[in-house]
Amino acid sequence: MSGYDGGYSGGGGRGGGGYGGGGYGRDRGGDRGGDRNGGGFGGRSNGNGYGGGGYGGGGGGYGGGGFGGGAGGDRMGALGSGLKNQEWDINSLPKFEKSFYKEHPDVETRSDADVEAFRRKHQMTIAGSNVPKPVETFDEAGFPRYVMDEVKAQGFPAPTAIQSQGWPMALSGRDVVGIAETGSGKTLTYCLPSIVHINAQPLLAPGDGPIVLVLAPTRELAVQIQEEMKKFGRSSRIRNTCVYGGVPKGPQIRDLSRGVEVCIATPGRLIDMLEAGKTNLRRVTYLVLDEADRMLDMGFEPQIRKIIGQIRPDRQTLMWSATWPKEVRALASDFLQDFIQVNIGSMELAANHRITQIVEVVTEMEKRDRMIKHMEKVMENKENKILIFVGTKRVADEITRFLRQDGWPALSIHGDKQQNERDWVLDQFKTGKSPIMVATDVASRGIDVRNITHVLNYDYPNNSEDYIHRIGRTGRAGAMGTAITLFTTDNQKQARDLVNVLQEAKQQIDPRLVEMTRYGGGGGRGYGGWGRGRGGGRANAHNANNMPIGNRRW
């Protein structure tokens, strides 16, 4: 059996047929270079998945790949040049249902004053004409029983703010813009209405593409969305697939050819599939753009426009974003019709107020020692998880090696890691087997790991928006969190913006940081510090995750 023969066990589709059994991994199983000295991640394949060997041993390079971009991932450039925008005659297109919302009696009788009070309490603002009232309970949302049973099985106490307002908006069939912080529950805000939408459409015929298309910026976010879709679409036997770069195309092509109601995709790989004729978007009537701001930041706008040009214009479109910059507004005005909008929280760039922000002004040479001091305190609690952000892939590997040599079970994730290594690292971090993860900015969005208690900015990012996205990995879903930032004179030009963020969130501010705001320019040159300190060095840094852990400190 060739590994990936199927992969989505059970389930089947609304029209019958299952995904079959099968494993995960193709015949060749292991990672390139994984068998030079035995061991390594994957080793030699046994034909059934990740192959023998452990995630240790010598050798084993992790080249290639790409993480939401780069070689092996979503290539850019001329991508989509083979796609022609479709000409649509609306009158000749098959009609479809998209309006399913029926206001619950309790919602209907709720006064305007009560509605306004609810919106104020949840920092909710709306825009557009005839925006439906928010719902306050799951029952008020009016989902069919097959959806509600799955929701209640998860044990959620009540809808989140974005769900309260977003569900009636999405179920009404209108085009929707939702602005809310990461971790606010927006995935379910569009997932559950999509299930209702799918079940109101004709069954897929052979050769049909998906009914629901979700575009996401990174593989990790795409996989997270797929997990939610699987969970809540199970009772409706809705089939889905995840289409992203950095892995073999064969299994994704197989899923698409068998027929799926839902396709979750990164733009680059989806365009590959469309150009190769492996799927089409003629049946798409429910389009979701998730983390639209991040997709534009990553340069996907031309690809998004190419993809939307393949979809009928009377579709329902839902756009979700953590921020509302002019680039996202322009995309919304081009592709959404008479849309209604909900914003949760301030429209200004602001940090989550449940996060305690600690900013220390240090020299470059002091950073490693300060990081260790914080680690010792944080990891006193064995339940804690810490995500460490660095500026480059090289530093990610250097810091990971340094931490492992110092006795800390750290692993790194960045754009030069193969997809199966990234998946393994994420799983180790999620399960707490390795509670310390070092990441570049490419991981600052789209990775949904619950219960991250601490974020440490070893290197400060290029702008305050990325700072807010980074620290937003903690303090999610109502929890408290802590963000620690090591700030050097090299970051001086960012000082004023950072002080503004800290003041807005009513945080304590290091007087030395305030002092920096009084001087312009880029600050001093710092002290370098590459490969210094305990166990530094760059030799063989690409193999940092295989580095043996020294005398354990955790």
UniProtKB/Swiss-Prot annotation:
Residues 357-517 form the Helicase C-terminal domain. It is an enzyme of class 3 (hydrolase). Residues 167-342 form the Helicase ATP-binding domain. Disulfide bonds: none annotated. Belongs to the DEAD box helicase family. DDX5/DBP2 subfamily. Keywords: ATP-binding, Cytoplasm, Helicase, Hydrolase, Nonsense-mediated mRNA decay, Nucleotide-binding, Nucleus, Ribosome biogenesis, RNA-binding, rRNA processing. The keyword S-adenosyl-L-methionine does not apply. A motif (DEAD box) lies at residues 290-293. Its EC number is 3.6.4.13. ATP binds at residues 180-187. Residues 1-24, 36-47 have a biased composition (Gly residues). One of its GO terms (biological process) is rRNA processing. This is ATP-dependent RNA helicase DBP2. Its main location: cytoplasm. The Q motif is unique to and characteristic of the DEAD box family of RNA helicases and controls ATP binding and hydrolysis. The lineage of its organism: Eukaryota, Fungi, Dikarya, Ascomycota, Pezizomycotina. Residues 1-47 are annotated as: Disordered. A motif (Q motif) lies at residues 136-164.
